[in-house]
Amino acid sequence: MALTSDLGKQIKLKEVEGTLLQPATVDNWSQIQSFEAKPDDLLICTYPKAGTTWIQEIVDMIEQNGDVEKCQRAIIQHRHPFIEWARPPQPSGVEKAKAMPSPRILKTHLSTQLLPPSFWENNCKFLYVARNAKDCMVSYYHFQRMNHMLPDPGTWEEYFETFINGKVVWGSWFDHVKGWWEMKDRHQILFLFYEDIKRDPKHEIRKVMQFMGKKVDETVLDKIVQETSFEKMKENPMTNRSTVSKSILDQSISSFMRKGTVGDWKNHFTVAQNERFDEIYRRKMEGTSINFCMEL
């Protein structure tokens, strides 16, 4: 599948089991699939634009007992290896993870069916964050506009069709969320909602701490809540991707950390799109007990 970016270059996405992925990821697929997870690994799992960087910073702050300086040791993308990441000649996510001492905190956007089997076999812990599909779509649209490693999204109307048909990198939102939701009672999965973290960060961060087997006092917990707020992270060069070259992420088009709100979809969806989306959602998510908050 070749899609032209606004740079005029062809970005040819490749497919694995019906899911579109970046070409370098697919070229590295056998290495990714044979990745050796360890029983004490914690894997942060999200669909793209569902609060990945946010939960990474929360987890790291907990791991470092609220020590802000320790969390400044490296940019966020270097702290938690992204297992399916590949961009030769840079070390791949798998190589970075292999070089990391245990216990490891890793990251993925892969669906349950594409995840390296060793994660299931080793009974690892999984931390999944889900965000409502409409806000995910809006955020992903703006991310594709500014990310030169991904195909140009076209107009909002065109992207709406692309997204609902699952023809985006990492595949269908519906399949991704449904897959992880259905696995949550069979494995060590803490399933969180972006909207809940937004509504009551302290309550949700406490859940993450308990899941990680960590204890911090109330003062430290309050500090973690404060330091992982959208406003703080947007200004933090270790989380806001400001160190990434403009040739890769052009933040003059759209900020990497754009709004971080619940309900921004209402500024993008037409009435007709909203009605159509709701109908597709009902059909695709039929039989699942999952419920999303669409506005706060």
Swiss-Prot record:
GO cellular component, one term: mitochondrion
Active site (catalytic residues): H109 (proton acceptor)
Record-annotated disulphide pairs: none
Compartments reported by the entry: Cytoplasm; Lysosome; Mitochondrion
Positions annotated to bind substrate: K107, T108, H109
Phosphoserine modified-residue sites: S139, S254
UniProt main location, coarse: cytoplasm
Positions bound to 3'-phosphoadenylyl sulfate: 49-54, 131, 139, 194, 228-233, 256-260
Keyword Phosphoprotein included in the entry's annotation: yes
Tissue expression per record: Found in adult stomach, kidney and thyroid gland, and in fetal kidney and liver.
Gene Ontology process terms (BP): amine metabolic process; sulfation
Database matches in InterPro entries: P-loop_NTPase, Sulfotransferase_dom
Enzymatic reactions: a phenol + 3'-phosphoadenylyl sulfate = an aryl sulfate + adenosine 3',5'-bisphosphate + H(+); cholesterol + 3'-phosphoadenylyl sulfate = cholesterol sulfate + adenosine 3',5'-bisphosphate + H(+)
Highest taxon of source: Eukaryota
EC number from the UniProt entry: 2.8.2.1
Keywords, alphabetical: Cytoplasm, Lysosome, Mitochondrion, Phosphoprotein, Transferase
Entry GO MF terms: aryl sulfotransferase activity; cholesterol sulfotransferase activity; sulfotransferase activity
Function in brief: Sulfotransferase that utilizes 3'-phospho-5'-adenylyl sulfate (PAPS) to catalyze the sulfate conjugation of phenolic compounds. Does not transfer sulfate to steroids, dopamine, acetaminophen, or alpha-naphthol. Except in mitochondria, where it can add sulfate to cholesterol producing cholesterol sulfate, which alters mitochondrial membrane organization, and impacts protein complex mobility increasing state-III respiration, thereby modulating mitochondrial respiration.
Membership in a protein family: Belongs to the sulfotransferase 1 family.
UniProt name for this protein: Sulfotransferase 1C2
Organism in which the protein naturally occurs: Homo sapiens (Human)
